[in-house]
């Protein structure tokens, strides 16, 4: 066993340095991106925040858009509000973990991993759900240690599950993880608390579906539920690639064009998972650690099987973030037991790789934002409802729409080519013939 110990004062300095660098990297991650780390889904979140209380879709819950909306009351626009949500999510995790003495060192390193830096800098709901996942695991520990009565524990855990479902529908998976963990421990006093709260969460989703989703979108089931979307061979390949990048502590994005570099990226992820498996088997897991690992694995398994009937993006580090964070927590706790303070080097190494990647592929969001703002003002479109033509959402033209959405989020896609003849429909060509947008060197 190679254990490296530091004096508390020196370890504290290392922790402070790691946190400061992580904050800086989160900010640089979106400022040095040509469009500020947004995606087509980000447009939907910011647009929903902009037009609320009007509901224009139920593809995602209202939790994240409403959080963005809240900070717009402090003179921030929707883009900057979303970035503040990410920074606050990171801050809440640190403060909560420190005050409760709950995996504090582990969560500090996890948050410094480049994949999680990318999450906190992304205008996506995963950033907001992460603090509640940590709180959920903490509540599980308290219940296992019998700190709560059946009623109190069930109430707190049910409330946390309901909050997560209101941020991401995949929060429902934690309900099933709850029930399975409870059934696996049916001889212990706390099993009823986990089972009951899981059932409450599922019942809440059922009520939510019939009273909210169906009310605003009667065709939700017809639109998103479709059996046989992808063959098993493709899903298994995507699962392997997604898991290998999710559990790569340094690089979470593979080269879509393939190449030898992907062998290294996937290889590191596979080795990390094998090391996790070895440590989890070799060292005895506590009941709390079992709860965290089992719940996380159930969510990952359900994320795979849901793809057979539900239209969703391929498994990747972002979709897996709420489910991988728990496994990372237990893994880093085991690494601290074996290597001590040397474990901090993983966080610093990941930040270094992340900075190199960010710098080599850097764009200039602030400059591009200035150009887009000028364009929208000149065209009197700053506060108008916009339409933007793209062939499909995989088209590179989408990036121009994403950039526009950071200034005016009230934008919709149109896929009808004839719409490009209309004056009120924007295209990439119409925008870029009037302004210059600086692109990332590496897409």
Regions found by a protein language model. Name each.
Residues 32-47, 55-67, 365-368:
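Extracytoplasmic catalytic/substrate-binding loops of multi-pass membrane glycan-assembly enzymes
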Residues 46-50, 349-441:
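Membrane-embedded, lumen/periplasm-facing catalytic core of multi-pass transferases
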Residues 19, 108, 152-155, 159, ...:
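Signature aromatic-anchored transmembrane alpha helix within multi-pass, membrane-resident enzymes
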Residues 190-274:
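Membrane-lumen/periplasm interface segments of specific transmembrane helices
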Residues 46, 50, 126-128, 132, ...:
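Hydrophobic/aromatic-rich transmembrane helices and adjacent perimembrane loops
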Residues 28-36, 114-121, 163-165, 206-210, ...:
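Transmembrane-helix signature of polytopic, lipid-linked glycan biosynthesis machinery
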Residues 30, 62-65, 79-93, 109-132, ...:
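Aromatic- and kink-enriched transmembrane "portal" helix at the membrane-lumen/periplasm boundary
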Residues 116-117, 152-169, 175-180:
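Membrane-interface alpha helices of multi-pass inner-membrane proteins
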């Amino acid at each position: 066993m190679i254990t490296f110990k530091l004096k508390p004062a020196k370890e504290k300095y290392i922790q402070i340095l790691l946190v400061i660098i992580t904050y800086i990297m989160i900010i640089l991650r979106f400022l040095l991106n040509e469009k500020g780390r947004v995606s087509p889904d980000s447009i939907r979140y910011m647009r929903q925040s902009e037009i609320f209380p009007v509901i224009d879709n139920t593809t995602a819950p209202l939790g994240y858009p409403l959080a963005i909306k809240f900070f717009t009351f402090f003179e921030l626009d929707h883009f900057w509000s979303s970035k503040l949500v990410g920074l606050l999510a990171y801050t809440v995790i640190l403060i909560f973990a420190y005050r409760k003495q709950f995996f504090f060192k582990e969560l500090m390193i996890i948050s410094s991993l480049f994949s999680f830096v990318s999450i906190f800098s992304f205008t996506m709901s995963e950033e907001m759900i992460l603090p509640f996942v940590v709180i959920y695991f903490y509540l599980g520990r308290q219940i296992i240690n019998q700190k709560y009565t059946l009623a109190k524990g069930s109430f707190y855990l049910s409330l946390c599950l309901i909050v997560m479902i209101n941020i991401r529908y995949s929060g429902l998976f934690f309900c099933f993880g709850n029930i399975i963990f409870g059934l696996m421990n049916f001889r212990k006093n706390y099993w009823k608390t986990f089972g009951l709260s899981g059932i409450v969460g599922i019942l809440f989703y059922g009520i939510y579906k019939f009273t909210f989703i169906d009310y605003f979108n009667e065709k939700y089931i017809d639109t998103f539920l479709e059996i046989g979307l992808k063959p098993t061979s493709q899903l298994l390949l995507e699962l392997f690639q997604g898991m290998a990048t999710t559990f790569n502590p340094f690089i979470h994005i593979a080269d879509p064009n393939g190449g030898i570099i992907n062998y290294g990226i996937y290889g590191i992820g596979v080795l990390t998972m094998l090391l996790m498996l070895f440590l989890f088997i070799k060292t005895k897991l506590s009941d709390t650690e079992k709860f965290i690992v089992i719940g996380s694995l159930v969510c990952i398994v359900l994320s795979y099987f849901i793809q057979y009937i539900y239209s969703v993006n391929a498994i990747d580090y972002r979709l897996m973030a709420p489910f991988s964070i728990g496994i990372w927590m237990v893994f880093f706790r085991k690494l601290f037991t074996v290597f001590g303070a040397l474990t901090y080097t993983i966080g610093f190494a990941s930040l270094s790789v992340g900075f190199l990647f960010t710098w080599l592929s850097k764009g200039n969001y602030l400059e591009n934002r200035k150009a887009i703002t000028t364009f929208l003002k000149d065209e009197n479109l700053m506060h108008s409802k916009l339409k933007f033509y793209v062939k499909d959402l995989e088209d590179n033209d989408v990036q121009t729409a994403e950039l526009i959405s950071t200034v005016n989020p009230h934008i919709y896609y149109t896929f009808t080519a004839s719409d490009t003849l209309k004056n009120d429909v924007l295209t990439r060509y119409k925008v870029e013939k009037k302004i210059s947008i600086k692109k990332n060197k590496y897409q």
